[in-house]
């Protein structure tokens, strides 16, 4: 099993959707990627999740997991495709997203990113993924 995760700025433009679609489909059809981990913050995550759901109609074997940065509250729509990383309950709220991002990097082979600035959480996550030897694909 080969996995991919995603990092991007909260305020990404919808114009990257086609590139995102192409890159994900390329990973599925040419590189055997069948597991996708995605966060739950911002427009990049929402757009990526929508693209993955659309691709799952054609590639029935792929698995899509939403990885939470915070423990779900009672009454949250807890679905089978949700992962809570081990140790997240001990992470300070300020660092919970970093903890979640590190988990996604550690469990992935590829990273698809939309990063246009040299600061912020998405930038830091991509830099960490590079240091860990992950294959980075930029969508800009």
Region annotations inferred by a language model:
Residues 1-140:
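Acidic/glycine-enriched connector segments
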């Amino acid at each position: 099993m080969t996995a991919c995760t995603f990092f991007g700025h909260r305020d990404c433009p919808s114009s990257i959707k086609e590139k995102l679609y192409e890159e994900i489909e390329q990973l599925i059809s040419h590189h055997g990627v069948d597991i996708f981990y995605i966060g739950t913050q911002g427009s990049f995550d929402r757009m990526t999740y929508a693209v993955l759901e659309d691709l799952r109609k054609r590639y029935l074997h792929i698995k899509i997991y939403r990885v939470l940065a915070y423990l779900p509250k009672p009454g949250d729509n807890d679905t089978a495709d949700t992962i809570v990383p081990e140790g997240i309950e001990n992470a300070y709220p300020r660092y919970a997203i970093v903890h979640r991002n590190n988990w996604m990097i550690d469990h992935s082979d590829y990273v698809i990113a939309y990063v246009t600035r040299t600061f912020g959480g998405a930038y830091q996550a991509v830099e960490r993924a590079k240091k860990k030897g992950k294959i980075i694909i930029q969508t800009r």
